Amino acid sequence: MDATSKRLTRTTVASQVRDFIVMEIAQGRLPLGAPVREMEIAAQLGTSQTPVREAFRELAALGLLESRIHVGTRVRQLAEKDLVEAVPIRSALEGIAGRLAANNYHKHAEEVRGSFEAMKEVAEGGDRRVFAAASTTFHRSVVRAAENASLLRAWNALGIEVMTILAMASSDIPLDDAAESHRPIVDALEAGDPELAEHALTHHVAAYLPATAHSNGGVDAAVQAS
């Protein structure tokens, strides 16, 4: 295995560790303020501490974890507030992306439509974490279709997949309905209507997570899906 393959494998494991921790937070098994220890997570998942450390760094950058000298790593107390504050930013960014993507859709139709169909297929499996990844892939395909590098960088910086995992873990909306809620976005893009695409994305994102609150120590998201 060459260096690139080793790096890819480690990155994949780190992403799995990240998703596991996010689910633990979302479902209340790691309440806000709770300590999170590298050795314990590594032992629990049967992996080395290296991918766990990488996952910790990513989640700290997203504001879900915080590390302090002589204290260790904990679930950040303001994680929910940060998520709520990120929603209108994401809504605005994706609205702009929709407007731009509508004019470029003919070049990206296969990717956007393909990711939408893949999301619907994944929904049938009932795995919310897998669905969150598929939903993120769809939204990323729309932002990519905007063909604006600055917009894509800003969108990526929000940690969309983590936001989506948190929302889906705490929501009881059927995944088939969650997938179908993306159809107006696809319809607007296929119609080549910038204003309609902007409205569809802005409304979709703003509606799915208007607020979060404690629920048995976890994160209770609104019932709309990302």
Swiss-Prot record:
Keywords, alphabetical: DNA-binding, Plasmid, Repressor, Transcription, Transcription regulation
Induction remarks: Is constitutively expressed at low levels regardless of the presence or absence of D-xylose.
GO BP terms, alphabetized: D-xylose catabolic process; regulation of D-xylose catabolic process; regulation of DNA-templated transcription
Pathway of action: Carbohydrate metabolism; D-xylose degradation [regulation]
Keyword DNA-binding: yes
InterPro entries: GntR_C, TF_FadR/GntR_C, Tscrpt_reg_HTH_GntR, WH-like_DNA-bd_sf, WH_DNA-bd_sf
Key word Transferase present: no
A Pfam family of this chain: GntR
Protein origin, superkingdom: Bacteria
Gene3D superfamilies: GntR ligand-binding domain-like, Winged helix-like DNA-binding domain superfamily/Winged helix DNA-binding domain
GO molecular function per UniProt: DNA binding; DNA-binding transcription factor activity
Matches recorded under PROSITE patterns: HTH_GNTR (PS50949)
Role according to the record: Transcriptional regulator involved in the regulation of the entire oxidative D-xylose degradation pathway via repression of the corresponding genes.
Name used for this protein in its record: Probable D-xylose utilization operon transcriptional repressor
UniProt source species: Paenarthrobacter nicotinovorans (Arthrobacter nicotinovorans)
Organism ancestry: Bacteria, Bacillati, Actinomycetota, Actinomycetes, Micrococcales
Name of the encoding gene: gntR
